[in-house]
Amino acid sequence: MNITEFAQYAGVSKAAVSRYFNGGYLSAEKRAQIETAVEATGYRPSMQAQMLRTRRTRQVGVILPKLSSDSCPRMVEGIGSVLEESGYQLLLINTANDTKKELQALDTLRQHTVDGIILIAALYTPEHKTLLEHLHVPIVTLGQNFPGCCSVYHDDAGAAQAATAHMLAKGRRAPGYIGVTLLDKCAGQQRRAGFEAALKAAGLPLHPERMAVAKFSQESGYEQAAKLLERSPHIDCLFCATDAIALGAMQYCREHSIRIPEDVMIASVGDSKVGRNAFVPLTSAHLHYKTAGRDAAALLMELLADPHTVPRSQMLGFELVCRESTND
């Protein structure tokens, strides 16, 4: 069935059918007629024809670093709700924390002629900078504040500072830190900056030997906690950049008779389900991942409506959720 035949069946003009499928204005009566006809016939316009006419695919590419993480599905849920409301389809690419795959995904989506891209980035490298400058596709970065791009990100420094300060306020004076690579501007640089700010505010010196860098996994958190606590057994509280790292550190403590929170308090960022249900419930800063996804998608819709929109950044807040790992 072509558009002429469908319009005749629905009892409306071809122009009305076109406005309906392209999100234009229609009277309630005509919209109801077309919806009834769609249900009866299953008619959908040709995607190729729409692309030729509007130069739009009604598709948005979303690149994420780890589908199995606790945060990414929540962000994608928020993105998907806005895209659905706006009549867009979501194309998802999982890069498994591989920077090369992330860069390849950006190039693939550019060639696939998607209308826009939301990048849930793991790192910001010189290669990212070069590719983003020459992308020529509307893009919003989510979770990272990239220069020159529209971005939605979290107050990572504030979250880390609050989590660390909470333990110091309970009298702990030998804090340790397990972070992630500084190539990650938010989870790496900003959360470390927050940890350091908490120590400075408390009048405590920074001891590099009490600091370690892990990968984004529970296994790596376990390994780095082992090295850190064997090297500095007097550590009495530990800030971890992610819940996964914190859970690995907690597992090491349990296996080596280090009591949480009596011997070592532990806090982190993410407020994941596994952290909430850990053998010692984990104190963690709650980040609004679903809201971030919705806001990023809404920002992309603004870019698509007006390509001359001035790039802007939006930082979301957090709540520190205190639990038994910090004696709460």
Model segments located where?
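Amphipathic helical "hinge" segments at domain boundaries
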Residues: 43-116, 193-196, 207, 237
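Flexible loop/hinge segments that line or gate small-molecule binding clefts
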Residues: 97, 120-162, 182-183, 204, ...
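N-terminal helix-turn-helix DNA-binding module of bacterial transcription factors
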Residues: 1-58
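Hydrophobic alpha-helical segments within soluble ligand-binding/sensing domains
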Residues: 152-177, 193-197, 218-226, 246, ...
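Periplasmic-binding protein-like
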Residues: 114-120, 176-179, 211, 232-242, ...
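Short, solvent-exposed amphipathic alpha-helices that sit
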Residues: 33, 71-85, 159-163, 186-205, ...
